[in-house]
Amino acid sequence: MELIEILLKKLNKNAVVTEIAKDKDPFKVLISTIISARTKDEVTEEVSKKLFKEIKDVDDLLNIDEEKLADLIYPAGFYKNKAKNLKKLAKILKENYNGKVPDSLEELLKLPGVGRKTANLVITLAFNKDGICVDTHVHRICNRWEIVDTETPEETEFELRKKLPKKYWKVINNLLVVFGREICSSKSKCDKCFKEIKEKCPYYEKIKHFENILKKFNFRKVSKNKIPNEKGTYILKIRLKEGKKIKFGKTERFFKKGYYFYIGSAFGNSMNLKNRIERHLKDDKKMHWHIDYLLKYGKIEEIYITNERVECEVANEFIKKFDFVENFGCSDCKCKSHLFYLKP
């Protein structure tokens, strides 16, 4: 938990919903959190201020016209659906909870538009109860830091409940939302990260190791439409958006969502980097190599090439820091794998 402690000392900023929650009004926290889904921070802040000038409590929400409500929360993402859910929410709160927001996770989860993230945020921010709010930022960063190894935010929440000391439960969401939006985003800005974090971050260690491999073997990045007619070794960076069970050869295994680095080469008499990599890029190809089966579901995002004959040497460098898919793409050599994994 050393990385969390470092961030607590380094960051002095609140996420928007945390700011809204300062007056401990459960109604405002609940409504703002629902609005914040799939919505940028600055939009959530603007919409919440505009909305709470007209909507002070459940009765106001119950009495407002749905179309007017939708106009008030525009341009929040899915504003029409959110307006519909907020109207349903107001009715249920009035009829079942005397117009009050319930203070338990179980009751909050019964409300329309309320998932585990929202429910946990309400009980922690509005009622000061123990909960762990896991959104995409918390899920992504806890996986990158190898605190958990999970596929979904819900899985991350349950793992954190087992592993995370309770003193961090209430603060981890605000901490990692701010850090995730500004630095450790889906396209990480490692160059902007704190030196103390980089020294201990397992994700940064892998990113740096990959950069060192590129330098060591003189790789250069090329675009898909400018692959040269040259001999050489290549690395494909492939993105798999969702976890998938994939069969290659006689083997079937689950491939986690994230990034895969595949190492290949083109040194045959009639083979060069251009025709080899362009074959990988085709959708309508005969399934032959292991990589063909992964590319049926994954997308090539980056291509790196070198004119050096270093396929196995590169694989042996990757294996020092990266997880690998055993026996993938290496049937004609002694390498353990030519496919390596990086969490998203």
Swiss-Prot record:
Enzyme class: lyase
Protein name in UniProt: Endonuclease III
Superkingdom of this protein's organism: Archaea
Reactions performed catalytically: 2'-deoxyribonucleotide-(2'-deoxyribose 5'-phosphate)-2'-deoxyribonucleotide-DNA = a 3'-end 2'-deoxyribonucleotide-(2,3-dehydro-2,3-deoxyribose 5'-phosphate)-DNA + a 5'-end 5'-phospho-2'-deoxyribonucleoside-DNA + H(+)
Domain GIY-YIG span(s) in chain numbering: 229-328
Family annotation (InterPro entries): DNA_glycosylase, DUF123, Endonuclease-III-like_CS2, GIY-YIG_endonuc, HhH-GPD_domain, HhH_base_excis_C, HhH_motif, Nth
Cofactor note: Binds 1 [4Fe-4S] cluster.
Top-level taxonomy: Archaea, Methanobacteriati, Methanobacteriota, Methanomada group, Methanococci
Family classification: Belongs to the Nth/MutY family.
UniProt cross-references to PANTHER family, sorted A to Z: ENDONUCLEASE III-LIKE PROTEIN 1
Function as written in the Swiss-Prot or TrEMBL entry: DNA repair enzyme that has both DNA N-glycosylase activity and AP-lyase activity. The DNA N-glycosylase activity releases various damaged pyrimidines from DNA by cleaving the N-glycosidic bond, leaving an AP (apurinic/apyrimidinic) site. The AP-lyase activity cleaves the phosphodiester bond 3' to the AP site by a beta-elimination, leaving a 3'-terminal unsaturated sugar and a product with a terminal 5'-phosphate.
UniProt cofactor(s): [4Fe-4S] cluster
Annotated keywords: 4Fe-4S, DNA damage, DNA repair, DNA-binding, Glycosidase, Hydrolase, Iron, Iron-sulfur, Lyase, Metal-binding
